[in-house]
């Protein structure tokens, strides 16, 4: 799903926002990502999703700061002709800010693949001496993908995200076309990725970055 608009209420003040945001639900998991003007930072979350008494219960397991636990959000969802409307009451942000949000979402695709799901990076083979402590969460579903990366680059912590469209054939040859990212130069790029399912809970992907082949192994979350 791609967001069509969002209304935020804070301390009685109502603000309308338009932003590039994606949300993927698949196989009992969720992930969303966008550049958040409210907190002036990236805003990414992923975790478990399940229906309970007519509401979607989202339990985050990771966000842009890293692994998280102890949170649960009841998300009221109303189906629409083009997607759904989502209401979250009492969303807490850094500094104790409490926001109420109403989001309107449009369905982007119903495509499926064998790689659909929420994945956590296990190993990374790369000749990048300036990068360490590299962690990644990746979601694939509905013909789209999202990735969240946390790492240390040249001694400084960095956190980035990207999302776009995803196509893969029966041989595992995938094309990822970037739509939005916290890295401006990444937007609009088209990446060829070789993917292989090792079993139902693990896959590898390889791609060329700065002339070097990067190979990564993921485990299903």
What are these regions (language model features)?
Residues 1-46, 52-163, 169-221:
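Lipid interaction determinants
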């Amino acid at each position: 799903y791609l967001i069509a608009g969002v209304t935020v209420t804070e301390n009685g003040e109502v603000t309308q926002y338009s932003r590039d945001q994606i949300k993927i639900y698949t196989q009992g998991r969720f992930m969303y990502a966008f550049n958040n003007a409210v907190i002036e930072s990236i805003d990414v979350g992923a975790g478990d999703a399940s229906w309970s008494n007519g509401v979607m219960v989202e339990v985050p397991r990771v966000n842009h700061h890293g692994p998280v636990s102890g949170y649960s959000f009841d998300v009221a969802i109303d189906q629409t002709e083009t997607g759904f409307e989502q209401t979250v009451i009492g969303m807490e942000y850094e500094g104790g800010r409490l926001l109420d949000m109403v989001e309107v979402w449009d369905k982007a695709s119903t495509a499926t693949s064998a790689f659909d799901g929420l994945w956590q990076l296990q190993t990374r083979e790369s000749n990048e001496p300036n990068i360490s402590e590299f962690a990644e969460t990746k979601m694939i579903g509905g013909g789209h993908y999202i990735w969240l990366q946390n790492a240390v680059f040249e001694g400084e912590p960095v956190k980035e995200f990207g999302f776009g469209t995803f196509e893969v054939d029966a041989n595992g040859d995938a094309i990822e076309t970037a739509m939005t990212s916290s890295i401006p130069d990444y937007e609009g790029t088209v990446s060829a990725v070789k993917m292989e399912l090792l079993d139902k809970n693990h896959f590898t992907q390889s791609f060329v970055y700065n002339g070097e082949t990067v190979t990564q192994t993921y485990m299903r979350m």
